[in-house]
Amino acid sequence: MLESYQAQNQYHSDSPQKGNLKIFFGYAAGVGKTYAMLEAAHQAQKRGIDIVVGYIERHTRPDTLALLEGLEQLPEKIVEYKGIELKELDLDAALQRRPTILLVDELAHSNAAGCRHSKRYQDVEELLRAGISVYTTVNVQHLES
């Protein structure tokens, strides 16, 4: 049990400096949250900020796909579930790469079985605790009041 806990927290930073969270918010799928996040990433990159794509839901939108060009992208974690391959954020790769800003699409996503956390927001919390800032997206229907 202790070994498992230590392995899961090997990238945890004792530094008081936590990452910042920037949320691109929208009312529905397809309104341009991911597009706006990628545009902001290019602007940050032009200012010399170390920014990396951790996970982007591609949705085969040509304009969105084009904005991925020129940005470093981490390989996605492939998880097999009921005979199909699912793509997830590779949290360990992100923590090891340690960019200033990491792009992580769909904050409200439920991770596949086999991932460290059941929800993507938990991945983001771990990244923030490690001092990595995160740009992410969320739709209003995923919020609770």
Model-derived features with residue positions:
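Catalytic, metal-anchored helix/loop core of enzyme active sites in primary metabolism
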Residues: 89, 97, 119, 128
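ASCE RecA-like P-loop NTPase motor cores
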Residues: 17-22, 132, 139-143
